[in-house]
A protein has these predicted regions:
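HotDog/MaoC-like acyl-thioester-processing domains
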Residues: 1-11, 90-157
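A generic structural signal for short beta-strands and their flanking turns/coil linkers
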Residues: 16, 24, 76-80, 94, ...
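Mid-chain, well-packed structural core segment of small domains
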Residues: 70-96
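Hydrophobic small-molecule pocket/channel-lining residues, especially in calycin-type beta-barrels
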Residues: 45, 87, 132
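Hot-dog-fold acyl-thioester-processing enzymes
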Residues: 1-76, 144-157
């Protein structure tokens, strides 16, 4: 790669999930302990004014974090933030994407070494192109690992 600035603007291959189902919501409820009936009880959700049950916000945030950590490694993540934008409904297909917004020498920290601090803009959209959750993440990765990922992404593009 041609210097740290050569990473900025690089988009990684997206990953799609779904179509998501009510069963996915119930599985997530079991894992998270969020048993709000809006997410699994159709009559309850409709009575509350919704057209159907819908996903917990953290469901799609979890998909986005899973996507990001598959790219650059769970052990390398240093920061992850999200903003919820739209609800996710049964039948939605979600697509996660990431773009590098910054890459700089990591500094003098004990775990810095030859590492780069890499910032990503993250987005999860539905099949209509609406952003359901957006976010950002910061990773500490080696330049070699980032180059290898960039090369692999170029091959699959």
């Amino acid at each position: 790669m041609n210097g740290k600035s050569g990473y900025v603007g690089r988009a990684f291959p997206p990953q799609s999930f779904g179509p998501v189902t009510r069963t996915d919501f119930v599985r997530y409820a079991g894992a998270s302990g969020d048993f709000n009936p809006m997410h699994h009880d159709e009559p309850y959700a409709v009575k509350a004014g919704n057209p159907s049950v819908f996903a917990m916000g953290m469901f799609q945030a979890g998909l986005l974090s899973s996507y990001a950590t598959r790219l650059l490694g769970a052990r390398n993540i240093r920061r992850f933030t999200v903003r919820f934008r739209e609800r996710v409904w049964p039948g939605d297909t979600l697509t996660c994407s990431a773009t590098v917004t910054a890459a700089a020498a990591a500094g003098d920290g004990a775990d810095a070494g030859d590492s780069l601090k890499v910032s990503l803009d993250l987005e999860c959209t539905n099949q209509e192109g609406k952003t359901v959750v957006s976010g950002s993440a910061e990773f500490l990765v080696s330049a070699d690992a980032l180059d290898a990922l960039a090369a692999a992404a170029a091959v699959t593009a």
